[in-house]
């Protein structure tokens, strides 16, 4: 077989099947037969035409697990038949960020499935620098290494230590991942979300304390969880302006806020509150190879699992016909994976 099925987002709200030649891996590339692909908010927003800096047509999908079925030249440490996850961030390796090891915020970053074609296809050729061995991990779990890695990067940015009291605001996939990883790192974790369904999901899957940030006594409830104090570290995964503006009110003096959720606008908070607490506030973008490696290790150890965030599975063969109904309009969806 020399051709493959590819699902292309031709334009907003239009997914079409096409046949393409199976790519031939170039030097320092591996050909991957796709096993599973996670569905991200990026894939949903791109379908709706709401993803900035996005061009059509595009093959979506950047949370990828597959099996190596072909290797280019100059590759010694990978082999055919090996299961791998894809690190979708292709960095230039030349800008100041890359040279300082922060390839996650490369000035010229190109993301597989966003800026170049991704995993909604049967095969994909990937630079070997963007491959993480994932043998021994369930393929659906391995497809979720990427979102877990984003969570791991936020936890690393927060410099969370064992025993620290951490509040995660927002119980979508990234917030769930951050809570799970902070817990695995030994922190005392509380999760806040306004959605009853998401709070129930966290209570069932992660067995962590849950709070409703819209409750009138939210401050008192938070202090009750942390022995009378506010949080030492807050990770905000909401991307919600009001929630992000309020984070400075949720940390104790000397506390840290990390924004891993993105709001496409301006934020505003009390400067006196910010200063008197000597707040450390930072953003968290994408993930580095070190974050991917940590997630792979935690999955292999059973400390984080796909079931912590995964709620739905979709067969690739019928995705064009079911995407709008079962993904876009599915109010119960927290995290979905495409199976091949």
Swiss-Prot record:
UniProt induction comment: Highly up-regulated during growth on L-galactonate.
Binding sites annotated in the UniProt record for Zn(2+) 2: 92, 95, 98, 106
Cross-referenced Pfam families: ADH_N, ADH_zinc_N
One annotated GO biological process: L-galactonate catabolic process
Enzyme Commission identifier(s): 1.1.1.414
Summary of the knockout phenotype: Cells lacking this gene fail to grow on L-galactonate as sole carbon source.
Regulation: Inhibited by EDTA.
GO molecular function: oxidoreductase activity, acting on the CH-OH group of donors, NAD or NADP as acceptor; zinc ion binding
Catalytic activity as recorded in UniProt: L-galactonate + NAD(+) = keto-D-tagaturonate + NADH + H(+)
Sorted UniProt keywords: Metal-binding, NAD, Oxidoreductase, Zinc
Cofactor binding annotation: Binds 2 Zn(2+) ions per subunit.
Annotated function: Catalyzes the oxidation of L-galactonate to D-tagaturonate. Required for growth on L-galactonate as the sole carbon source. In vitro, can also use L-gulonate.
Protein family (similarity comment): Belongs to the zinc-containing alcohol dehydrogenase family.
Entry protein name: L-galactonate-5-dehydrogenase
Species of the source: Escherichia coli (strain K12)
Organism phylogeny: Bacteria, Pseudomonadati, Pseudomonadota, Gammaproteobacteria, Enterobacterales
